[in-house]
C-alpha cells in the first residue's frame, strides 16, 4: 500500500475472548476469583513482612518488593480483561494499547532482574555468611531494588517508542486476551524488522543474562550445601532458598516456553495459554509457594490471624474440663 494512502488506526479490537455467553461467564468468574486470591496473597506477604519484626531482614525485603511487583503485573492485565467481558466492549485505544504494553513488559522485565537479585542475596547468605550483613546491608538492598526497577523501566523504553511510531492501517483485530506485542506487530503495515531485532536482542539478553546469574548463584549454593558437615545443616541451608528456587523454575520455565513458542509461530491457542500461564497463573501460585515452604511467614500469618491464641484457649478449656 502506498504510504500516502495509509489511514492510521486509532483503536484495536481484542478477539481472543470466547463468543459463548456461558464460557464468557465462566472465564469472568475464574479471572475474578484468581485476581482476588492473587491480590490477597500478595498483600498478605507485603503486610506481614512490613509489620512483623522477625521479617525485617534482607530476604523478606526483597520478597515484599517482588510481591508488590507481581501485584502490579496482574493488575495491568486482569482488570481490563474483566471489563471487556463484563461490558462486551472489546475495543482498546491505540494510546491505551501502547501504555498497557509498556507497563506489562516493564514489570515483566523488572521481575527477572529482581529474581536475579534475590538469587544473589541467597548466595551471599549461604556461601558468605560472615560477610553477609556487611555486603547486603539495608542501603545496598534498597539500591539493588531501585536499580532493578530503573533497569526494567529503561529496558523496554526503546522497543515501546519504536512500536508507537509504527503505522497501523488495518485490519485492527488483535487475536489475544490482552495487548501483546507479536499479535500487534502482525497488524502493522510498516517495516517491523528493526523493532523485531531490537526486541529479540533485549529479551534474549535479559532472559539469558538473569538466568545465567541465577544459575551460577544456585550452583555455588548447591556446592556449599553439599559440603555441610551434617544433614541438619544441609536441610537448614536448603530450606532458606527452596521457595525462591521453586518460583525461579516456574517463572523461567514458563517464560522460556512462551519465548520459544512465539519465536516458532506455533498454534495461536497454545501461545494464548502460555501467556495466561506466565502473567496470571504464575503470580497466583507464588504466594502459596512462599507461605507453604516458609516457616517464618507461616508463623507470622498464624499470629496475625490469632490462631496461637485460639489454640491456647482451646487447650485451656480441654484441661479445665478434664479436671
From Swiss-Prot:
Membrane-spanning intervals of the chain: 26-46, 55-75, 100-120, 140-160, 198-217, 238-258, 272-292
Annotated PANTHER family: OLFACTORY RECEPTOR, OLFACTORY RECEPTOR 6T1
Record-given protein name: Olfactory receptor 6T1
Origin organism lineage: Eukaryota, Metazoa, Chordata, Craniata, Vertebrata
Entry function: Odorant receptor.
Coiled coil residues, start to end: none
Segments in the Extracellular topological domain: 1-25, 76-99, 161-197, 259-271
Membrane topology listed for this record: Multi-pass membrane protein
Glycan-carrying positions: 5
Amino acid at each position: 500500500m502506498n504510504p500516502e494512502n495509509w489511514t492510521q488506526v486509532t483503536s484495536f479490537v481484542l478477539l481472543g475472548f470466547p463468543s459463548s455467553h456461558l464460557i464468557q461467564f465462566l472465564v469472568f468468574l475464574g479471572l475474578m476469583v484468581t485476581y482476588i486470591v492473587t491480590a490477597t496473597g500478595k498483600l498478605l506477604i507485603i503486610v506481614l513482612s512490613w509489620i512483623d519484626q522477625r521479617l525485617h531482614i534482607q530476604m523478606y525485603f526483597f520478597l515484599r518488593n517482588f510481591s508488590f511487583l507481581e501485584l502490579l503485573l496482574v493488575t495491568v492485565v486482569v482488570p481490563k480483561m474483566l471489563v471487556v467481558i463484563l461490558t462486551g466492549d472489546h475495543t482498546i485505544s491505540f494510546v491505551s494499547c501502547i501504555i498497557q504494553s509498556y507497563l506489562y513488559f516493564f514489570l515483566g522485565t523488572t521481575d527477572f532482574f529482581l529474581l536475579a537479585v534475590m538469587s544473589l542475596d541467597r548466595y551471599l547468605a549461604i556461601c558468605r555468611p560472615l560477610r553477609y550483613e556487611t555486603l547486603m546491608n539495608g542501603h545496598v538492598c534498597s539500591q539493588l531494588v531501585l536499580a532493578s526497577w530503573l533497569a526494567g523501566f529503561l529496558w523496554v523504553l526503546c522497543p515501546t517508542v519504536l512500536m508507537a511510531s509504527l503505522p497501523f492501517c488495518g485490519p485492527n483485530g488483535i487475536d489475544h486476551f490482552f495487548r501483546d506485542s507479536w499479535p500487534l506487530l502482525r497488524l502493522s503495515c510498516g517495516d517491523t524488522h528493526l523493532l523485531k531485532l531490537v526486541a529479540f536482542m533485549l529479551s534474549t539478553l535479559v532472559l539469558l543474562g538473569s538466568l545465567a546469574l541465577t544459575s551460577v548463584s544456585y550452583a555455588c549454593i548447591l556446592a556449599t550445601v553439599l559440603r555441610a558437615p551434617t544433614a541438619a545443616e544441609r536441610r537448614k541451608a536448603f530450606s532458606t532458598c527452596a521457595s525462591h528456587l521453586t518460583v525461579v523454575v516456574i517463572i523461567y520455565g514458563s517464560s522460556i516456553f512462551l519465548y520459544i513458542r512465539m519465536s516458532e509461530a506455533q498454534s495461536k491457542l497454545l501461545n494464548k495459554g502460555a501467556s495466561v500461564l506466565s502473567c496470571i497463573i504464575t503470580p497466583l501460585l507464588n504466594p502459596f509457594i512462599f507461605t507453604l515452604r516458609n516457616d517464618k511467614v507461616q508463623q507470622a500469618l498464624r499470629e496475625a490471624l490469632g490462631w496461637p491464641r485460639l489454640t491456647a484457649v482451646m487447650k485451656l478449656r480441654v484441661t479445665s474440663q478434664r479436671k
